[in-house]
Amino acid sequence: MWSKKFTLKKLILGGYLFAQKVYCEDESNSIYGTWSSKSNQVFTGPGFYDPVDELLIEPSLPGLSYSFTEDGWYEEATYQVSGNPRNPTCPMASLIYQHGTYNISENGTLVLNPIEVDGRQLFSDPCNDDGVSTYSRYNQTETFKEYAVGIDPYHGIYTLQLYQYDGTPMQPLYLAYRPPMMLPTETLNPTSSATSTDDSSSNKKRSLRSLVRRSLENRHKTNAIKRQNTSFLTSNAIWYISAGMLGVGSLLFLAF
């Protein structure tokens, strides 16, 4: 009798683990989409950076956001505020925008390679800059030793955990949009390396600026949507299936 009961328990547990595996294998390892930190106020896309007027737009709260496409492009939006220990009334703040390409190595290392001429930073130090923030180009390759995608047990949404080059975990990011909300995946502000007679380069830049302007005008009409679980095996479904299997197992355990 004990052998039958033990085998039944193993079957129930195996069925539960299989259901979890089927549900997670589809998207659990994908970084595709727009991810945002807990403040849920910082997102990539035209709401953070206007490449036409080269304007960084300050969110209501600090935070971090990354977006990734399926074909190797990424975008980053960062709003950081750090305290001033000498004068708490003068916190320093920086807004950083970058985009470019990314690659994932066989050992799981994630490397972000920005487009050098497109990165921008707005730095504010009110106690030392006379109220005039510093706006400059920004170019910083980022290397993450590894990353992990999982499901937050409390909110039931996907989370992205990035680990810095030395293995230190960063603040977790939460899936906000899929497909990602991003600016065009090409050089937004190319430098003037060609002559004035280069009509193709000039036309390309005008075309890009028109594309970006339309993106800005339609910032509230993006096709990026809040990510919701649409598959049959959602986290709630798994819970009910598991509870049902455990209930049936308990009845069979008592019956035999």
Swiss-Prot record:
InterPro entries: Rot1. Residues 25-235 are lumenal. Residues 203-212 have a biased composition (Basic residues). It holds the Pfam family Rot1. This is Protein ROT1. Residues 191-200 have a biased composition (Low complexity). It comes from the Eukaryota. It is a single-pass type I membrane protein. One of its GO terms (biological process) is 'de novo' protein folding. Residues 186-213 are annotated as: Disordered. PANTHER family: PROTEIN ROT1 (PTHR28090:SF1). Keywords: Endoplasmic reticulum, Glycoprotein, Membrane, Signal, Transmembrane, Transmembrane helix. It is found in: Endoplasmic reticulum membrane. The chain crosses the membrane at residues 236-256. Glycans are attached at N103, N107, N139, N229. Residues 1-24 form the signal peptide. One of its GO terms (molecular function) is unfolded protein binding. One of its GO terms (cellular component) is endoplasmic reticulum membrane. Required for normal levels of the cell wall 1,6-beta-glucan. Involved in a protein folding machinery chaperoning proteins acting in various physiological processes including cell wall synthesis and lysis of autophagic bodies. Controls actin cytoskeleton polarization to the mother-bud neck and CLB2 protein stability.
